[in-house]
């Protein structure tokens, strides 16, 4: 697996219909209002490639611990429920202009496990997303993206997931085509650019732009 320790690790909350309800996170986002009812609720950091120093308790220091693994998921030391969250992961190039993100170009994709702590009441969504090394799963080999638009390679792929227990495979969730995301392709990258540039510290969300600046990205 390629080392992504110099990359920013960001996730999207609520880009599938009813996903937040299924993940037990709908209550966390009850006060987040979006212009488009189908739009994702926001973004969260799961890995920051620097050690940030802040007068506040955010971002949490644990976010500077590299969490990705293609071999295993290490459960938290604390006694909490953990759930697998099958997703597609994107590797992207980012261009900046005047201190803001101006362009995002997805270059590779692969299976991704946005493994999360399932526990209500955590202050920020990122509090559930990184508890140390090996807390996120990613494919051993990623695939090249020919074009991040309809008609490209990603049209032919879907997300499916299985859990192995006692030597038996069990289907986990429903098979969903990648273009089944509420926002995808240009609609998604446009939304990400705007969200990172404008998202405030509110409710379960954090000021990601300030984190990026602190990491000199």
Regions found by a protein language model. Name each.
Residues 1-3:
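A short acidic-Thr-Gly-centered motif at the start of a beta-strand
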């Amino acid at each position: 697996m390629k080392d992504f320790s110099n990359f920013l690790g960001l996730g999207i909350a609520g880009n599938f219909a009813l996903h937040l309800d299924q993940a037990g996170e709908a209550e966390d986002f009850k006060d987040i209002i979006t212009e488009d009812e189908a739009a994702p609720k926001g973004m969260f950091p799961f890995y920051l490639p620097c050690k940030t120093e802040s007068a506040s308790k955010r971002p949490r220091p644990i976010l500077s611990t590299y969490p990705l693994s293609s071999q295993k998921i290490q459960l938290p030391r604390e006694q909490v429920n953990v759930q697998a969250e099958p997703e597609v992961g994107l590797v992207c190039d980012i261009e900046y202009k005047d201190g803001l993100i101006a362009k995002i170009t997805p270059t590779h994709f692969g299976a991704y496990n946005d493994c999360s702590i399932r526990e209500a009441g955590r202050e920020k969504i990122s509090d559930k997303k990184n508890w140390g090394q090996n807390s996120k799963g990613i494919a051993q080999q990623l695939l090249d993206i020919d074009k991040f638009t309809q008609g490209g390679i990603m049209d032919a792929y879907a997300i499916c997931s299985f859990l192995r227990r006692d030597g038996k495979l069990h289907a986990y969730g429903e098979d969903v085509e990648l273009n089944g995301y509420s926002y995808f392709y240009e609609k998604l990258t446009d939304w990400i650019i705007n969200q990172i540039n404008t998202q405030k510290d509110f409710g379960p969300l954090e000021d990601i732009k300030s984190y990026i600046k602190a990491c000199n990205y």
